[in-house]
Amino acid sequence: SSAASDVYKRQSYHTPDGEVPALNHVSLTLRPGTVTALVGPSGSGKSTLATMLARFRDPDFGTVRIGGVDLRELPSTDLYRLVSFVLQDPYLQRQSIRDVITLARPDATEQQVRDAARTARILDDIDALPAGFDTVLGEDTNLSGGQKQRLSIARAVLADAPILVLDEATAATDPDCEAEIQQALAALARGRTVLVIGHHAESVIGADVICVMENGSIAACGTAEQLAEQPYWVRLSAGRIMEGVTR
């Protein structure tokens, strides 16, 4: 529902080790069905802000809300049905591949699990393992970075959550199938409320809203056209910045 996919962040800020604020009184509303991209230099707070939506961390002050409900009041099972995430360095616990994919849908059928793996271009890799979907990560096998990415995409596909948190650098972790992963991500994002952690101008230029972050605050928000005079966006668009590092 539109209410479930209306994400609202208000005065959220987080201080690692109680020192410099990683986020400083940030307010941001994600409208249902739109794509919002966060861009900014390394350390600007974009990943901290985005991962709060998946409750990897909670704000010291302020709230993160979905449909008016504070995330801290939501059971994790409900949160996983509302928010799925595909991040640059997916943290996968020591559990079976099946358990990883079915995080939000533990009652999924075998066919649904296989279909999700197929959509994420990881099914053949799983079937090639002696234990298949029962393979325990970190014990029976160690997956490549690209395979872990595709596993997290399969999890998001199966979850079918209305909100998606996505790091657009995901595809770059596996050059051999970068185009396939991009296609899977594009299909996954369609029709959802999406929050993108952006690193390259061309990958976020079509976003409904682009927010430029600096020093834990939002410096400017708008379309690519509206940000034409914003210094960081100008440098990013000109290709002078890669992965948040000026070259």
Regions found by a protein language model. Give the residues of each.
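Short, small-residue-biased leader/transition segments that mark boundaries at the very start
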Residues: 1-8, 94
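A short, flexible loop at the N-terminus of ABC-type nucleotide-binding domains that lies
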Residues: 2, 12-25, 75
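Conserved beta-strand
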Residues: 9, 21-31, 36, 62, ...
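ABC ATPase NBD Q-loop/coupling interface
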Residues: 14, 63-78, 179
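The feature captures the beta-strand-to-loop junction immediately N-terminal to the Walker
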Residues: 39-41
